[in-house]
């Protein structure tokens, strides 16, 4: 690849527990980014197909956007964190979440959502045909967006794995 994409790292965020703070609704408590912002939701968009090198097949890269809003009602505007992830990044993130939750709070394992399914092994001979199909990609995008929102807006998961959430939202270098 001759052209490289330069990515500017977002300003670091800190997820805080504000359970005892009055005036913050329960739905917002689970998505606090720092003392000034909360994560309202995330979007998975802009699927870009990348040609792998030599024997590596083509793969999809998804744009993940987390929307931050100020906690202060007098403040206006919102901020967005953008990062780009492959399906395999979501798989690694989910596996890391499962490992963390199993050790810290085993009863919460069921709160970690499933990811959309990968290409079935018996279709591996036509992997590119299936994995790059527009309908397949549209369904995968919906599943990834559902997954990331269920994770980011779940206070139990964020409380247990703040560092993993922040690491996932950081762009690769």
UniProtKB/Swiss-Prot annotation:
Q: Which SUPFAM superfamilies match?
A: PX domain
Keywords per UniProt: Endosome, Membrane, Vacuole
**Which cellular components does GO assign to this protein?**
endosome membrane; nucleus-vacuole junction; vacuolar membrane
Gene Ontology BP, a term: protein localization to membrane
Topology in membrane: Peripheral membrane protein
What is an example of a GO molecular function annotated in this UniProt entry?
A: phosphatidylinositol-3-phosphate binding
InterPro entries per UniProt: PX_dom, PX_dom_sf, Ypt35_PX
Q: Where is the PX domain?
A: 40-173
What's the superkingdom here?
Eukaryota
Q: What is its main location?
A: membrane
Q: Which Pfam families match?
A: PX
Record's subcellular location: Endosome membrane; Vacuole membrane
Q: What is known about what this protein does?
A: Recruits the lipid transfer protein VPS13 to endosomal and vacuolar membranes.
Domain text from the record?
The PX domain binds phosphatidylinositol 3-phosphate (PtdIns(3)P) which is necessary for peripheral membrane localization.
- Family listed: Belongs to the YPT35 family.
Q: Would you tell me the protein name for this molecule?
A: Endosomal/vacuolar adapter protein YPT35
- Tell me what gene encodes this: YPT35
